[in-house]
Amino acid sequence: GNELGFPKGDHSDFSCLSQEMIDYCIQDVAVTEAVHKQLVKNMAQFLPECIELEHKVQWIVQQQEINGWVLDQKLANELCATFKEGMNDIQSELQEMFPPIVEERHSEKTKKRLKDKVTVFNVGSRQQVAERLETKGAVWSELTPSGKPVVDEKTLKQNSHVPEAAKVLEYLLLQKRHAQVLSWLEAVKEDGRVHGRVISNGAVTGRMTHQSPNMAQVPAGHSPYGKECRSCWTVPVGKKLVGFDASGLELRMLAHYMDDKEFTNVLLTEDIHTRNQMAAGLETRPQAKTFIYAFLYGAGD
């Protein structure tokens, strides 16, 4: 509303009819009308077929959101407990690897000995993790603007030859999986389903975005604990859950615009990502996928 010259205002008391409420309602309608006119104006730059396609996709996505996904709450709770137990076990192991640091304390005035300061290792403290792992030979390749080591999945993997770093990495993975499954359980409605939101054209690239919770981030089956996490999603008795994946949509669109017979033939008869890997001299197929999609979506522009 502010961008279109119609400040929406604010009104919170709807206990009884008032002039302020009426004014708020009128302004709300004016804002909605202004937004509609602006959208109609913006739509003029798109082909009618594009607009129709977006609306058809949104209808399907909305139906998906309404239907929701059945979550096996018993299995999800058991999985949460397993992850939590694993985190506690690793925490205990790390506290044995890194004994408490004891610092003597003395009174500044009397110089009398005070109770020692005891710092028990906390795997949740990135600063403690960095300091303790450095004593075991870890080297940090990235630093924060303030000069402190960046402790994350990437830098821990670089130090995975250090047993203690590998333990911390496993802890963070379990912590992440626990948070994911817990978010599903917290989102379950009375019908036993999770109704995650999908914005069909939410990203600047035109791709979909997901929230409350992000259903697109359910771990892949080949990733650590991915199979267990995916097993939490099910269907009512008597139904079957069918999975499928579209193959190379962006590359098929690229083939359309390139109109190159050789590229199209490779796309349809071979593994295009392996071919790109060889052509670009990359080490792995996933690197080739990252490269081509980064290029197509404008990385480096």
Q: What is the meaning of each model-derived region?
A:
Residues 2, 298-301:
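Short, intrinsically disordered, charge-balanced linker/junction segments flanking boundaries
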Residues 3, 7-8, 19-225, 234, ...:
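Conserved "right-hand" nucleotidyltransferase catalytic core of DNA-directed polymerases
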Residues 54-57, 285-289:
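Short, leucine-enriched amphipathic alpha-helices that occur as contiguous helical runs
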Residues 55, 123, 267-269, 295-299:
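Short acidic alpha-helix initiation/capping motifs at coil-to-helix transition points
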Residues 63, 287-298:
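Short, amphipathic alpha-helical "recognition" segments used to contact nucleic acids or chromatin
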Residues 243, 250-281:
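Metal-dependent catalytic core segments for phosphate chemistry
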